[in-house]
Amino acid sequence: MRTRSLIVPIVLISLAVPLSAQMSRVALVRQSDIIFAGTVTRAGVVRVDQVFEKPDAVSLMKGDSVAVVAARAGSPPLNPGMQATFYTTGWIYGRWITVREVGHEPIGPQLATVAGTGTAQQDLVAGARQQVNDADLKARIQTAAMVVVGRVEQIRPPAYTGAPARPKRFTEHDPNWQEAIIHVDEGLKGATAGERVVVRFPGSRDVAFVGTPKFAAGQEGTFLLRKDSATGSPLALMAGQTVQAYTALHRLDVLSKQDAPHVRTLMRTP
């Protein structure tokens, strides 16, 4: 049975300046990983009314109390009864959770009402996060050499055409490079249907490669590929031919097959 205290003190290093005086909601969301709506109950204390975003490892729920500490002497106080959305980043975790406030956005009566999918403010935060995610994905698409929808036919050891340009260094963080042979079902950028592409990825489970996409035979998806500049040997062998090798090392480079329509839409958007 999980035991939790009724009061979770969280220190906010607060700018105590409303959103309009700082930056756009999208900019606030981009810099934040803990976002919640709350009501000031007394000087320096906020009751959490709704949690919009937080890391899975952070325990923060409706009804928890948050201690708000101003970052600068003379900052405007948060008055009792004030409702706001707080955009913050986690800092210190222990008996007290300490977060830095990026900014806060006062919630007026028009935003406190319940919308069809939750509070109106929740919808605004979710919309801003979607804009952030789309902007990040579009940037990855624009810099990719190839964008394809396809299926991994096989995984094999790397077939280098020559010795890597950089001597191999043997460390505990050896990437253990592997190659995925991907059959292109649909080429969205830089490829045509029916092609086969060599994609290199670190097979190592070392902490240095946590979050780096891994491939498996039979895997289907939408892949954003870049010419291999990581292994020191950018060319590979396939069916007796020398071909360009690619990588997909960012979490946004490997998406589901169902994400292909959204990728197409972003590619058409100016």
What are these regions (language model features)?
Residues 1-5:
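Positively charged n-region of N-terminal signal peptides that target proteins for export
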Residues 7-18:
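Bacterial N-terminal signal peptides
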Residues 18-270:
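Transition segments tied to proteolytic processing and entry into folded domains
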